[in-house]
Amino acid sequence: MAEVANNEQQAPQFNIQRVYTKDVSFETPNSPAVFQKEWNPEVKLDLDTRSAKLADDVYEVVLSLTVTAQNGGDTAFLCEVQQAGIFSITGLTEPQLAHSLGAYCPNFLFPYARETVGSLVGRGTFPQLNLAPVNFDALFAQYVQQRQAAATAPAAEEANA
């Protein structure tokens, strides 16, 4: 019986406490002239994530999206959204926790951020903008590889000295 209780305590737990918009900005620096041009934009998306421990097993994850649309060499709009969530996460190893905070949570937050961006762009009276899905697992794996390479680079330099 005690063994069953221990197994239940060791089982990973993931709970979403809250999802919220932390910060929003929408700018149309070249309006109204931008509305007079033929619409053929170049859209750039920049992503960033960060996490902070709020309490034991409670974390805030913030997904930041910056969408810039250039049209005819001018900035048509600049949209910035910080979508955040508070998550309770227990029973994970450090690598599993890092993956959850760096990939799983941002993947959960992305649809909310995408909807906010789409809504702001529409309110700016621009054509609908649908952001493509993002593979946060691949981005996190790339981040881990870059950190590992950076950690081994100083050791290699010292060995060559």
Swiss-Prot record:
Keywords for the protein's UniProt record, in alphabetical order: Chaperone, Cytoplasm, Protein transport, Translocation, Transport
GO BP terms in the entry: protein folding; protein tetramerization; protein transport
A GO CC term attached to the entry: cytoplasm
Compartments it resides in: Cytoplasm
Alphabetized InterPro entries for the sequence: SecB, SecB-like_sf
A GO MF label: unfolded protein binding
Q: Which Pfam families does this chain map to?
A: SecB
Q: What does this protein do?
A: One of the proteins required for the normal export of preproteins out of the cell cytoplasm. It is a molecular chaperone that binds to a subset of precursor proteins, maintaining them in a translocation-competent state. It also specifically binds to its receptor SecA.
Q: How does it assemble?
A: Homotetramer, a dimer of dimers. One homotetramer interacts with 1 SecA dimer.
Q: Which family does it belong to?
A: Belongs to the SecB family.
Q: What protein name is recorded for this chain?
A: Protein-export protein SecB
Query: What species is this protein from?
Result: Shewanella baltica (strain OS155 / ATCC BAA-1091)
This protein's gene is called: secB
